[in-house]
């Protein structure tokens, strides 16, 4: 069932995607050479971050109760903070789509997701350290923060080289840790939905549903190690971005299509899995865009 919230989430995603591709058309067309396909994908980093933010925004205004419930209990005015975050998501999505004030918006975006980690997900993970999903949530939002700061580092390289360097290093280390952790989880629990391994089990009707977990782990593990060691880091980050982009289409878009007649909560969950995976792709591609193309320059980042 398509509720008004789910409808607005879908329309926002489609609208921002179309606008982002249009604005990025010159960068996409300019990608040439041996790594042309990856370069074309990297050119869409801003769009791949903006679109999920736009998808998330509507549910902060008229969405499920869990959005307001996620605000820490010690903070007053839960509806206000939910609406505030929705406005922030739309502002960041618009900035990244139009390529205006990217340094400011991506810096603030990184701070916002880091606050989510510190105020919401890390306390939950520490309260039950054996819960693997708690740490998956921590690394997910920490990776989103890293993607924002990778963009901020890229766009502050000329004016603040030292700040740019540590922001990109932070992003590289965070995404390395997340990729390695997620790879291990995929190998241990291949039946769970691939990419960012949260609670959802891959539906049995998806072809090769368990194999998807192993394939994801086989790509994430070497890519994470490459990022950690800073060896072929740009290719490693782009590979993670390409994997997550592919997973957004299959199985997550396929699951959304199959859920078109399902209860609104199931459709909302499917939309959120698409946005999560797509945003993780955008974060990895943002890091790739900030890293040097020439492997001999790895010492600078």
PLM region descriptions:
Residues 1-62, 81-91, 98-191, 207-218, ...:
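Extended, low-polarity transmembrane helix blocks
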Residues 68, 75, 101-105:
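Polar, glycosylation-prone regions of secreted, cell-surface, and some intracellular proteins
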Residues 75, 201-202, 243, 263:
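Residue-level signal for alpha-helical context at structural boundaries
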């Amino acid at each position: 069932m398509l509720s008004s919230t789910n409808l607005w989430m879908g329309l926002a995603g489609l609208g921002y995607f179309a606008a982002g591709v249009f604005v990025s058309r010159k960068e996409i067309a300019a990608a040439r050479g041996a790594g042309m396909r990856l370069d074309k994908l990297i050119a869409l980093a801003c769009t791949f971050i903006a679109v999920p933010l736009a998808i998330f925004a509507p549910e902060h205004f008229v969405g499920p109760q869990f959005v307001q419930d996620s605000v820490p209990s010690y903070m007053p005015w839960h509806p206000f903070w939910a609406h505030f975050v929705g406005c922030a998501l739309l502002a960041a999505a618009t900035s990244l789509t139009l390529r205006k004030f990217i340094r400011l918006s991506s810096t603030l975006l990184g701070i916002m997701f880091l606050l989510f980690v510190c105020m919401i997900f890390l306390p939950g993970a520490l309260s039950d350290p054996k819960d693997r999903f708690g740490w998956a949530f921590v690394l997910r939002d920490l990776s989103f923060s890293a993607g924002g700061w990778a963009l901020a580092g890229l766009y502050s390289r000329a004016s603040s080289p030292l700040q740019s360097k540590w922001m990109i290093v932070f992003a590289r280390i965070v995404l390395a840790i997340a990729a390695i952790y997620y790879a291990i989880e995929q190998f241990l629990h291949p039946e769970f939905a691939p990419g960012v391994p949260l609670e959802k089990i891959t539906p049995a009707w998806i072809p090769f549903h368990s194999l998807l977990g192993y394939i994801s782990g086989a790509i994430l593990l070497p890519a994470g190690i490459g990022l950690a060691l800073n060896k072929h880091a740009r290719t490693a980050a782009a590979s993670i971005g390409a994997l997550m982009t592919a997973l957004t289409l299959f199985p997550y878009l396929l699951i959304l299509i199959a859920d078109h007649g399902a209860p609104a909560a199931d459709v909302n969950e499917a939309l959120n899995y698409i946005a999560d995976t797509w945003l993780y792709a955008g974060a990895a591609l943002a890091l790739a865009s900030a890293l040097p193309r020439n492997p001999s320059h790895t010492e600078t980042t």
